[in-house]
Amino acid sequence: MENTVLNLDSDVIHACEAIFQPIRLVYTHAQTPDVSGVSMLEKIQQILPQIAKNAESAEQLRRVPDENIKLLKEIGLHRAFQPKVYGGLEMSLPDFANCIVTLAGACAGTAWAFSLLCTHSHQIAMFSKQLQDEIWLKDPDATASSSIAPFGKVEEVEGGIILNGDYGWSSGCDHAEYAIVGFNRFDADGNKIYSFGVIPRSDYEIVDNWYAQAIKSSGSKMLKLVNVFIPEYRISKAKDMMEGKSAGFGLYPDSKIFYTPYRPYFASGFSAVSLGIAERMIEAFKEKQRNRVRAYTGANVGLATPALMRIAESTHQVAAARALLEKTWEDHRIHGLNHQYPNKETLAFWRTNQAYAVKMCIEAVDRLMAAAGATSFMDNSELQRLFRDAHMTGAHAYTDYDVCAQILGRELMGMEPDPTMV
């Protein structure tokens, strides 16, 4: 046989591009266009260069830049899960999640914070009609940040509660008109009732304490509440929201998204951001490797066999993560379409699938970063930002796979849920 000479500058690069192509395009066909014929994903792609350009300055700012918020609101993404009666879009979870994946490749902090501002609208739609009217009839563009761990101290009073406390990790709070906060009430027998309340921006102070090493631009600051009165119509039991018993459940009988619990919507952004980071890491690694040579010998290391093996394995791993998430998102969409409330096992899979996908994305990013060279750790390197941000997506309580593995394992073995794991 005649020996074949492989042209590393063309043949290998084209082969790698063929591998990457399915990842970039796998879900674009599913987007639903608006009346102008342009899908939300296409609108995201149009503003993506400016979002990416702002990424480094956004880290220095430690919150989402005003320009990014303006761009995203101009295309209407903040209305993704708002009821149509208030001008919302009621997007399907697959369509929305893929927008966040794309956005995260440009700026993970922006994607993290804005996805939560969007998904909180789904949760608000589970509260009373009185609350929804109060928010969206006054300002149809209003959004809410959140801090739902029960940090505060509750005092029961006539018509509601008085709440005091410091509420951390409220991503996107600088750009929200309201906040959803968590707290514990107690019934007559002394049992805890985990609940949520909605408060307007005038009722709390934002404490600028967000000094993090990753997802820096999310602006996940602390909310300080001092003697805040929350009336009953702005309060809901968390359990009711997960079981279809809240005041807002059933208000929108024609909706395809409000017959599933709020929590899978709330959490969808975490895994979508992780996936977007990992997919961008593959592209950024490929761009860097094209002309990378060893400093001491001049040898081409970027297209050497070890680099090709790493990029191949990470590509497969990220594709597997995407496939798992797409199946989860689509299952969620079908449940909503059929007004079919998910059972406990389905909810357990929805929760834990996302955490496992995040785990795979982090592993894929780590594999590439380990072979990206010292310059990839410089402050101005996109790769080190992607590396840091990827790990932060796995640090959230909802994406902790050690917890999620126990949740799913208990469900699969017919055991009762552990109340210490949420």
UniProtKB/Swiss-Prot annotation:
GO terms for biological process: fatty acid beta-oxidation using acyl-CoA dehydrogenase. The keyword Lipid biosynthesis does not apply. Substrate binds at H120, S146, R263, P264, Y265, F266, Y296. It catalyses: 4-hydroxyphenylacetate + FMNH2 + O2 = 3,4-dihydroxyphenylacetate + FMN + H2O + H(+); 4-hydroxyphenylacetate + FADH2 + O2 = 3,4-dihydroxyphenylacetate + FAD + H2O + H(+). Pfam families: Acyl-CoA_dh_2 (PF08028), Acyl-CoA_dh_N (PF02771). The keyword Transferase does not apply. One of its GO terms (molecular function) is acyl-CoA dehydrogenase activity. It comes from the Bacteria. FMN binds at W112, S146, S147, I148, W169, S170, S171, R292, Y296, A374, T375, H396, A397. Inhibited by flavin concentrations greater than 15 uM. Also inhibited by excess p-hydroxyphenylacetate (HPA). Optimum pH is 6-10. Its EC number is 1.14.14.9. Pathway: Aromatic compound metabolism; 4-hydroxyphenylacetate degradation; pyruvate and succinate semialdehyde from 4-hydroxyphenylacetate: step 1/7. Oxygenase component of a two-component system that utilizes reduced FMN (FMNH2) supplied by the reductase component to catalyze the hydroxylation of 4-hydroxyphenylacetic acid, leading to the production of 3,4-dihydroxyphenylacetate (3,4-DHPA). Also utilizes other reduced flavins such as FADH2 and reduced riboflavin to a lesser extent. Only the compounds with a hydroxyl group in the para (p-) position can be hydroxylated. May also oxidize phenol to catechol, and hydroxylate other phenol derivatives. This is p-hydroxyphenylacetate 3-hydroxylase, oxygenase component.
